Amino acid sequence: MGANVLIMAGGTGGHVFPALACAREFQARGYTVHWLGTPRGIENDLVPAAGLPLHLINVSGLRGKGKLSLLKAPFVLIKAVLQARRVIRQLKPVCVLGFGGYVTGPGGVAAKLSGVPVIVHEQNAVAGTANRLLVPLAARVCEAFPDTFGASQSRRTTGNPVRTELFLETPREALAGRKARLLILGGSLGAEPLNKLLPEALAQVAPELRPEVFHQAGKNHDEVTAERYRAAGVEAQVQPFIKDMAQAYGWADLVVCRAGALTVSELAAAGLPSMLVPLPHAIDDHQTRNAEYLAREGAAFLMPQRTTGAADLAARLTEVLMQPERLDNMAQAARRLAKPGATHDVVNICLEVAHG
């Protein structure tokens, strides 16, 4: 067994999936990977399923909490730091790599107190609270999007680690002589505004121009979304989940979705044009900043939810569906932004820090 590495990531798939990609790379290089998480996050399902040992500490977020919770917060955080420090003393990792989530703050402090180098990776264009607080303690700071952390000698722009199978190598089937294919992603829990907006918008696109539609509506949202399409007179395949994202991306010519960091990175990896509707109440409006990264380079349209109605979306869809060459140009722009070496680069940075 090789030396230990400790990964800290929790809460959402946006933190956990890039961390899993790095875990696999560490393992391929002979390292033993352990994971630090919290009892309530998605890591409790994904990490054991990946065959990785999961260590838990008790910590949660502070935003929006009542006065009593805020009074207790220092004691909760101190306890979490002590829990994390026990794990670190037991494992003696050569480095600790944090991807965000509530676990990252106490875990990073514990690593620093234990003399173990800390590396931070931020997936979004706006850094999360835990990662921002850890920057002064970190030996290196990796960012997916340029200038997330500003000028710093410890900063490295790496991109987001994504699954290698998403970097599509086979050319996409030419649009000539067939209908375009539209992929709509609502996320695992469903983006209800998109589930309502798309059937209405597609009904306003001329039938001869209307694309084939595959709509991932989210858990418990597929039946009502399918009924909306039927009522609108639009043919669509609606599913709650997509098991094979590489296949779905390979099928699509255009994607409508939110602008989570991982989604934006996957769109670039797959070389797909997109219409991005950022989640309007995302913390620090980070999804808008993520979307701007693709939109600035001509790879996506940024369509704010508050100002985008069915008629607006229908007009934009009609515009690009009438110009296949524009979709091609957007796809090429997306591909130029892809970072196929992100996983390799993040792991290299960790090992350079760990071994000097």
Swiss-Prot record:
UDP-N-acetyl-alpha-D-glucosamine binds at residues 12-14, 124, 163, 188, 242, 261-266, 287. This is UDP-N-acetylglucosamine--N-acetylmuramyl-(pentapeptide) pyrophosphoryl-undecaprenol N-acetylglucosamine transferase. Pathway: Cell wall biogenesis; peptidoglycan biosynthesis. The gene is murG. GO terms for molecular function: UDP-N-acetyl-D-glucosamine:N-acetylmuramoyl-L-alanyl-D-glutamyl-meso-2,6-diaminopimelyl-D-alanyl-D-alanine-diphosphoundecaprenol 4-beta-N-acetylglucosaminlytransferase activity; undecaprenyldiphospho-muramoylpentapeptide beta-N-acetylglucosaminyltransferase activity. It catalyses: di-trans,octa-cis-undecaprenyl diphospho-N-acetyl-alpha-D-muramoyl-L-alanyl-D-glutamyl-meso-2,6-diaminopimeloyl-D-alanyl-D-alanine + UDP-N-acetyl-alpha-D-glucosamine = di-trans,octa-cis-undecaprenyl diphospho-[N-acetyl-alpha-D-glucosaminyl-(1->4)]-N-acetyl-alpha-D-muramoyl-L-alanyl-D-glutamyl-meso-2,6-diaminopimeloyl-D-alanyl-D-alanine + UDP + H(+). One of its GO terms (cellular component) is plasma membrane. It is a peripheral membrane protein. InterPro entries: GlcNAc_MurG, Glyco_trans_28_C, GlycoTrans_28_N. Belongs to the glycosyltransferase 28 family. MurG subfamily. Keywords: Cell cycle, Cell division, Cell inner membrane, Cell membrane, Cell shape, Cell wall biogenesis/degradation, Glycosyltransferase, Membrane, Peptidoglycan synthesis, Transferase. Its main location: membrane. It comes from the Bacteria. Cell wall formation. Catalyzes the transfer of a GlcNAc subunit on undecaprenyl-pyrophosphoryl-MurNAc-pentapeptide (lipid intermediate I) to form undecaprenyl-pyrophosphoryl-MurNAc-(pentapeptide)GlcNAc (lipid intermediate II). One of its GO terms (biological process) is carbohydrate metabolic process. SUPFAM superfamilies: UDP-Glycosyltransferase/glycogen phosphorylase. It is an enzyme of class 2 (transferase). Pfam families: Glyco_tran_28_C, Glyco_transf_28. NCBIfam families: murG (TIGR01133). Its EC number is 2.4.1.227. It is found in: Cell inner membrane.
